[in-house]
A protein has these predicted regions:
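Residues lining hydrophobic/aromatic ligand-binding pockets adjacent to catalytic sites
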Residues: 1-158
Length: 158
């Protein structure tokens, strides 16, 4: 696959990374309107108590207008979500082989205060690609020549 157009996600589903690894160039769609209750702000992990949802709180538009994906801001006032996510990952995976090799990088992601949701997505994406020892060329804006195929819709949370 030459190019792929994807919605940025928080710890994207594995199907999205499979599609990314099969493409030469990834374009993250940022000009679309943000949709609630998608993988853009949430991911699922396996914890000692079963499947667990991790959700990134966002600031909602006060004027009732739709917000573009690139303009979505993270809400740090509602809950200490970064501590919760990091502790959940530690509880679920600390005893897993090789977790210790990734723990410092994960901690750095969760200690950083990302202003925009997409900044968090980029850090997570770069972490995962580095952990997979893969390189990925990507664009942060709409790329009109991107080929949108059925496989490019995998993992969009829609």
């Amino acid at each position: 696959m030459e190019n792929i157009l994807l919605q940025p996600c928080y710890f994207s589903p594995i199907a999205q990374y499979a599609a990314i690894l099969q493409s030469k160039h990834v374009c993250f769609e940022l000009a679309d309107h943000f949709q609630k209750q998608t993988y853009r702000t949430r991911c699922y992990i396996y914890s000692p108590n079963g499947k667990q949802l991790l959700n990134v709180p966002i600031q909602h538009a006060k004027n009732g207008k739709k917000t573009k994906t690139k303009d979505v801001k993270i809400d740090y006032q509602t809950a200490p979500w970064q501590k919760i996510h990091l502790k959940s990952l530690q509880a679920g995976y600390r005893s897993s082989p090789f977790y210790e090799y990734y723990e410092d990088d994960l901690t750095a992601i969760f200690e950083k205060k990302h202003h925009y949701l997409f900044d968090l997505h980029l850090d997570v994406h770069e972490f995962v690609m580095e952990a997979l020892e893969e390189k990925c060329e990507f664009t942060k804006a709409i790329h009109k020549s991107a080929i949108i195929s059925s496989s490019s819709k995998i993992g969009t949370g829609a």
